[in-house]
UniProtKB/Swiss-Prot annotation:
Keyword tags: 4Fe-4S, Iron, Iron-sulfur, Metal-binding
InterPro entries on file: Fe/S_biogenesis_protein_NfuA, FeS_biogenesis, FSCA_dom_sf, HesB-like_dom_sf, NIF_FeS_clus_asmbl_NifU_C
Name of the gene encoding the protein in the UniProt record: nfuA
PANTHER family noted in UniProt: FE_S BIOGENESIS PROTEIN NFUA, IRON-SULFUR CLUSTER SCAFFOLD PROTEIN NFU-RELATED
Disulphide-bonded residues: none
Name used for this protein in its record: Fe/S biogenesis protein NfuA
One Gene Ontology term from the biological process aspect of the record: protein maturation
Organism: Mannheimia succiniciproducens (strain KCTC 0769BP / MBEL55E)
UniProt record similarity statement: Belongs to the NfuA family.
Length: 194
């Protein structure tokens, strides 16, 4: 795995914090609940006695970052920055693979489609309290989807399916996927977005 990208500004910030700690203290980058929708990334101090034999050490100019073996694959393509905004400065940690491991390009179609749904489509639907689940891919090449949360019973679900989800999936999986179909039994209720 390649090194986690830590900007110069973030490295400077960590160095300042580490200067106030016991000598030999470095940082630990980790993921809590990796591979789940509730995954959260974090950074903590890592004193010398907290380094495990199974940790991966990533060396930077003035310190090292340690990552435990469970978190490691979920931190692939992660970036840490220290951003200055109007309201002050803030440490940002982007880890696109924290919620789900990246799937290989030659993985079965169902795994690749599910990965796109979980990492690209569901985050868009989450603003409406909605989500979709991939049920199966038919022999004819259709992704069978189940809508849940705010999408269930929403009057806009057909538009979301045809113009949003299906279009995105067919473009990404051209030649492999013909379309998407909804098998949800929509029950309109207070949970429905529209």
């Amino acid at each position: 795995m390649q090194q986690i990208q830590i900007s110069d500004a973030a490295q400077g910030h960590f160095r300042k914090l580490l200067d106030q700690q016991e000598e030999g203290t470095n940082i630990r980058i980790f993921v809590v609940n990796p591979g789940t929708p509730n995954a959260e990334c974090g950074v903590s101090y890592c004193p010398p006695n907290a380094v495990e034999a199974t940790d991966t050490e990533m060396k930077y100019a003035t310190f090292s970052a340690f990552v435990d073996e469970v978190s490691l694959p979920f931190l692939e393509d992660a970036e840490i920055d220290y951003v200055t905004e109007e309201l002050g400065t803030q440490l940002t940690l982007k880890a696109p693979n924290a919620k789900m491991r990246k799937v290989a390009d030659d993985a079965p179609l169902i795994e690749r489609v599910d990965y796109v749904i979980q990492t690209q489509i569901n985050p868009q639907l989450a603003s409406h309290g909605g989500r979709i689940t991939l049920v199966e891919i038919t022999d004819e090449g259709y992704a069978i989807l189940q809508f849940g949360g705010g999408c269930n019973g929403c009057s806009m679900v057909d538009v979301t399916l045809k113009d949003g989800v299906e279009k995105q999936l067919v473009e990404l999986f051209a030649g492999e996927l013909k379309g998407a179909k909804d098998i949800t039994e929509h029950q309109r209720g207070e949970h429905s977005y529209y």
